[in-house]
Amino acid sequence: RSNSSKIDYRGELSINPFDLDLDINLGEYKIFQLLNLNAILKEFIKTGLLFNENLSLDVSINAKTKAIDQIFQSTQINFNIVNGKLNLNDTILINDKIGLLKLANSNLFVENNRLILNTDILIDVKDSMSLFSFLNTSKKSRNKFKSALINLDYDFLTNQIEFNNVKIDNKEVSDQFLNIIDDFKDNNSNNLIKSRRLINKLLSIYEG
């Protein structure tokens, strides 16, 4: 535990070969602050020093929040290095009323001097009505669903998102759905108001 804060941490470190297993508990912390890689960390990853087969890293960061302006109330962010490959597998974001979002089959890599994350995002909806209430979805568009699977590439340099595949309740979505979801592509302009509007537009064409 840090004496100057409420941060708890524990772990094990081996030097030769380098192997770090670290669990960090931040306690009360704004979730979206954790999701923004700062410039120094981005540049460090881009150096390629972490893409080393002699490195083994398993870091878990836990946080929760009661702030009303946050979509998620708790999170566990996992950062792993295995055989020179970086991933964020099993990172999870939880909304206590609506459900959760989980990363799987992820790969963090450098391509053309850009830091790219390719990942599956698994969305598990616990309560559709709570989701519709949060989004202010019109009654005629409230077609219930239990899960969604999205595969995407995220460019940390340009903040651009490329959607590769989307399934809802294990069914492929329409081309019209894919065209609309592509409006999320520029993450620089994404905000809660825009996200609500676009998601409701998607729900209006989803037939269930």
What do the PLM-derived regions correspond to, one by one?
Residues 1-208:
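Membrane-proximal interfacial segments on either side of biological membranes
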